[in-house]
Amino acid sequence: MNLNKHSERKFDLITVGRACIDLNAVEYNRPMEETMTFSKYVGGSPANIAIGTAKLGLKVGFIGKISADQHGRFIEKYMRDLSINTDGMVKDTEGRKVGLAFTEIKSPDECSILMYRENVADLYLTPEEISEDYIKEARVLLISGTALAQSPSREAVLKAVSLARKNDVAIAFELDYRPYTWTNTEETAVYYSLVAEQADVIIGTRDEFDMMENQVGGKNEATKAHLFQHQAEIVVIKHGVEGSFAYTKAGETFQAKAYKTKVLKTFGAGDSYASAFLYGLFSGESIETALKYGSAAASIVVSKHSSSDAMPTADEIKALIAQAE
C-alpha cells in the first residue's frame, strides 16, 4: 500500500482518541497494595502512537479532548515538546478529568492495570469539535477503537472517518479494545465493524478481531476475507509470542516473529507495534519489513518501564533486528 501520496500535506499522520496519564509502579515484583511510588507518563493508545511515530520522524497531529488542569497541561506540553501538533486538542470546559491508569508489575508475566475512567474528558469529544480543515491536511488518519465506546466521542470519530474518506485521507484503525469502557460485546462488534469496513489498514490482536466479530476462536482467513470485501488494503493480526501476520487485498501473506527480550511488563507493546509498522509503510519499506519494525518496537517497549517514554528510535529498531538476524 502506498502511503506516500499527498506528500505535500502538512501531516503524515493524525491520531484520534484519548490521551491520559499512566502512573507506572516503580517498585517491581509486588502487588499494588504494597506499592508506594509511581512514575508519571503520558498514556492512551492514540497518544502513544502519536508519540511513537513522532519519535520515528513522522509529522504528526492529534485530535482529542483533555482536562483543563495540571494533568491536561502536562499531556499537551509533553506532546508539543516532541513536535506533535496539538491544534486538534480540545480542553474540556465542564470539569472532566483525563483518565488515570495505575500499573501493577508483580512479575513479567503478571501485570495489571487499575483504570480510573469515570466521566473522562476524552469520551466527551463532540462532532462539532472535529475540523475538516485539520483532517484534510493529513495523509493518514488513525482511529483508536476505545474512542468508539461512548457518545459523543463515538459520533465525533464517525464524523472524522467520513471527512477522511471525503478528502482522500487513508484510514488506519487500531482496534485497541479495552473492556472497561464498553457496555456490551454486541455494541463493540457493531461500531468496530462500522469503522473497520471503511479503513484501509486494520491492526489488532486475534482476540480484538474476535471482539469485532462477536465470536471466540475466529480464524484469520475468515477475518481477512470479510474485510477485503470492503475498503481494507492491509490487515495485520497479532498472535503474541507466536508473531504477527499481515494480509493484503492482492492476496499476499507475510509473517514476522516476536523478538526475544527480557520482559519487564506486558503493556505498551501494541502502541509501539502500530507506530513502527506505520513508520515502515511511510518509509516505503516492504510490508514484511514493516512487520519486523513493529515486532522489534514492541519488544523494546516491553523491556522498559514506560510506554510513551520508551518508544524507540528507528536506529534502535534496526539495531535489534540486525542483532536478531
UniProtKB/Swiss-Prot annotation:
Q: Which GO terms describe its biological process?
A: inositol catabolic process
Tell me yes or no: is Nucleotide-binding among this UniProt entry's keywords: yes
GO molecular function (one): ATP binding
Q: What class of enzyme is it?
A: transferase
Q: In which pathway does it act?
A: Polyol metabolism; myo-inositol degradation into acetyl-CoA; acetyl-CoA from myo-inositol: step 5/7
What job does the chain carry out?
Answer: Catalyzes the phosphorylation of 5-dehydro-2-deoxy-D-gluconate (2-deoxy-5-keto-D-gluconate or DKG) to 6-phospho-5-dehydro-2-deoxy-D-gluconate (DKGP).
Q: What is its EC number?
A: 2.7.1.92
Would you identify the family this protein belongs to, as annotated?
Belongs to the carbohydrate kinase PfkB family.
InterPro entries annotated for this entry? Carboh/pur_kinase_PfkB_CS (IPR002173), DKG_kinase_firmi (IPR022841), Myo_inos_IolC (IPR030830), Myo_inos_IolC-like_sf (IPR023314), PfkB_Carbo_kinase (IPR050306), PfkB_dom (IPR011611), Ribokinase-like (IPR029056)
Q: Which reaction does it catalyse?
A: 5-dehydro-2-deoxy-D-gluconate + ATP = 6-phospho-5-dehydro-2-deoxy-D-gluconate + ADP + H(+)
Encoding gene (name): iolC
Q: Which PROSITE patterns match?
A: PFKB_KINASES_2
Record organism: Listeria monocytogenes serotype 4a (strain HCC23)
State the source organism's domain of life. Bacteria
Instruction: Alphabetically list the UniProt keywords.
Output: ATP-binding, Kinase, Nucleotide-binding, Transferase
Which protein is depicted? Answer: 5-dehydro-2-deoxygluconokinase
| Gene3D superfamilies xref list | 3.40.1190.20, putative 5-dehydro-2- deoxygluconokinase
Q: Name one Pfam family in it.
A: PfkB
